[in-house]
Curated annotation (Swiss-Prot):
Family label: Belongs to the major facilitator superfamily. Aromatic acid:H(+) symporter (AAHS) (TC 2.A.1.15) family.
Taxonomic placement: Bacteria, Pseudomonadati, Pseudomonadota, Gammaproteobacteria, Enterobacterales
Cytoplasmic side: 1-16, 75-81, 127-142, 186-217, 275-279, 328-339, 391-403
Role description: Uptake of 3-(3-hydroxyphenyl)propionate (3HPP) across the cytoplasmic membrane. Transport is driven by the proton motive force. Does not transport benzoate, 3-hydroxybenzoate or gentisate.
InterPro entries noted in UniProt: MFS, MFS_dom, MFS_trans_sf, Sugar_transporter_CS
PANTHER family: CARBOXYLIC ACID TRANSPORTER PROTEIN HOMOLOG (PTHR23508:SF10)
Name this protein carries in UniProt: 3-(3-hydroxy-phenyl)propionate transporter
Residues in the Periplasmic compartment per record: 38-53, 103-105, 164, 239-253, 301-306, 361-369
GO cellular component: membrane; plasma membrane
Chain ranges passing through the membrane: 17-37, 54-74, 82-102, 106-126, 143-163, 165-185, 218-238, 254-274, 280-300, 307-327, 340-360, 370-390
CDD domains named in the record: MFS_PcaK_like (cd17365)
Length: 403
């Protein structure tokens, strides 16, 4: 029986959200860093578009095993312990990115950075959702996840305000700050009360396909894959696409800043609306907004118009992604929650890895920006349908509502 008072529970929740927000902030900065530094990296290492696609995808490839293994280890050894190790890992390899000396070393540094980033996210979600409990879980996860687009906006600010800085600058920031956070997390981050109160064993992956969770697992995987395909294509390729459309690098960084501000706004707005709107309305809002914004990004020619298109793209693309992160913990019990979230994130990372590679291939074939954006439309429609079914069925397929 819990002995925590309401005030102590509230303090624990706020401390957890605050510290996890800071980690999410640095995760967002590092995820955006390669896109912001792309021009400098390509020039410094004389890389073509396909090679840059591999730079982008190496980091995303690392996210996949990181999310899968990080979630499983967290259900066995604790969310806090694995999160701290993850933060140390992506901080160290962000620094390694800044001192890379050739293409292979750069790819390896981005790969290992991705492993750390991937392992961190399911633990951020699990810690926050379990500290909040069922009633405030969606809101708490949305507040925490706001750190990701805000961190990405900070990276864009470095690109916009520091156009004359070395390309390594964003990676120095993305490495030093996480390493400073490590001792703070060790001292102040509470372990999940749900995890601490249970005897843990490594959950088998087949537990995700038990009768009460199989439908949710498959639907989550489907919508994660296609939504993250679009999000990471935008994060990695949009700055270079804008420059090819005739915008200045500083203007491209400004559009990325607008995109991430839209993402932060969408994370809060869509998270708050998740339990208030009908499923069909929510699904139509998110995915029709994504389609419209991609069309605008491929066709708008004015800088002000592109700023607006970037903001709307962030609002619905990353905002929609945050809704998925808030939804996922609802469908799994505490014994398999980090594993369930981690595997969904890992499948999403497959989409995230595919997006930059697909865009690079299409650009190499000469399809241009419009072709890249148009190719994303079928995936958005599939993801929208999966989210609609998932949200419609969640009251029937949610196995439990533990804290």
């Amino acid at each position: 029986m819990s002995t925590r008072t309401p005030s102590s529970s509230s303090s624990r929740l706020m401390l957890t959200i605050g510290l996890c927000f800071l980690v999410a902030l640095m995760e967002g900065l590092d995820l955006q860093a390669a896109g912001i530094a792309a021009g400098g990296i390509a020039q410094a290492f004389a890389l073509d578009k396909m090679q840059m696609g591999w730079i982008f995808s190496a980091g995303i490839l690392g996210l996949l095993p990181g999310a899968l293994v990080g979630g499983m280890l967290a259900d066995r050894y604790g969310r806090k312990r694995i999160l701290i190790g993850s933060v140390a890992l992506f901080g160290l390899f962000s620094l390694a990115t800044a001192i890379a000396w050739d293409f292979p070393s750069l790819v390896f540094a981005r790969l290992m950075t991705g492993v750390g980033l991937g392992a961190a996210l399911p633990n951020l979600i699990a810690l926050t959702s379990e500290a909040a409990g069922p009633r405030f879980r969606g809101t708490a996860v949305s507040l925490m996840y706001c750190g990701v687009p805000i961190g990405a906006a900070l990276a864009a600010t470095l690109g916009f305000a520091g156009a004359n800085l070395a390309w390594q600058t964003v990676f120095w920031v993305g490495g030093v700050v996480p390493l400073i956070l490590v001792p703070l997390l060790m001292r102040w981050l509470p372990e999940s009360a749900v995890f601490a109160g249970e005897k843990q064993s490594a959950p088998p992956l087949r537990a995700l396909f038990a009768p009460e969770t199989a439908t949710a697992t498959l639907l989550l995987w489907l919508c994660y894959f296609f939504t993250l395909l679009v999000v990471y294509m935008l994060i990695n390729w949009l700055p270079l696409l804008l420059v090819e459309q005739g915008f200045q690098p500083s203007q491209a960084a400004g559009v990325m800043f607008a995109l991430q501000m839209g993402a932060a706004s969408g994370t809060l707005m869509l998270g708050a609306l998740m339990d208030k709107l009908r499923p069909v309305t929510m699904s139509l809002l998110i995915y029709s907004g994504m389609l419209a914004s991609l069309l605008a990004l491929g066709t708008v020619s004015s800088f002000n118009g592109m700023l607006l298109a970037g903001f709307v793209a962030g609002l619905f693309a990353t905002g929609g992604q945050s809704v998925l992160y808030a939804l996922a913990p609802l469908f799994y019990s505490s014994q398999i929650r980090a594993t369930g979230v981690g595997t969904a994130v890992a499948v999403g990372r497959l989409g995230a890895m595919s997006g930059p590679l697909l865009a690079g291939k299409m650009l190499a074939l000469g399809t241009g920006t419009v072709g890249v954006m148009a190719a994303s439309a079928p995936g958005i429609l599939v993801a929208g349908l999966a989210v609609f079914i998932l949200m419609s069925r969640r009251s029937r397929i949610q196995p439990c509502a533990d804290a």
